[in-house]
């Protein structure tokens, strides 16, 4: 299974990084460069003028598609997104399967005040602290990759240091764990991380099961404004879109088309 392979590599990388820089020393670096995270909930809440929000992803590659964007300049892409009216950024930091890098976050943070999601396979508090140090505002927690106990612990730590989390689900069991963990933002991923197949009706099936008061995000396989409008009608507040935008020559125009402006 692809998810298992990614998690194995993540554990190996994490062990190496902890040896290079301890949790304590990583935390101390914040005092030299304090960062105040943005209000992610406010950024993703719909308004009368904006019935849904866009989290625009900065992604070079994926395990299922290989390299998606050859000419890949994270800061340039972020600037195009911001100019087009994006509401937040999602930045891939997983290096082996997605060609990501934590440095992408710090590079982008220098040029924007937009909320940034660290999108990675997070299994340890160390990675969440890294996200804060590098300038992220929220992190991805994948329910499928964590036990309920682990999810609760990581979410509690995330909130403790002032960050927010997008808790990603793919089925009813994931959703139950996300709800029990106290997640404020629940992301419904149409893509099965075990085999990377798409199930495009998933959001419509799971949205009615989500308690009131949560920010609901739909992820993967989204490539038309019609999809967004229809999912917004059933209760989705925001959409995380990556591959569709990464394949465009004119990213700015593609984002504006999705927003209907």
Curated annotation (Swiss-Prot):
Gene3D superfamilies attached to this UniProt entry: Aldolase class I
Entry keyword annotation includes Amino-acid biosynthesis: yes
EC class (word): lyase
One of the protein's GO biological processes: L-tryptophan biosynthetic process
UniProt entry keywords in alphabetical sequence: Amino-acid biosynthesis, Aromatic amino acid biosynthesis, Decarboxylase, Lyase, Tryptophan biosynthesis
EC number assigned by the record: 4.1.1.48
Pathway as given in its UniProt record: Amino-acid biosynthesis; L-tryptophan biosynthesis; L-tryptophan from chorismate: step 4/5
Family: Belongs to the TrpC family.
Protein name as it appears in the record: Indole-3-glycerol phosphate synthase
Lineage: Bacteria, Pseudomonadati, Campylobacterota, Epsilonproteobacteria, Campylobacterales
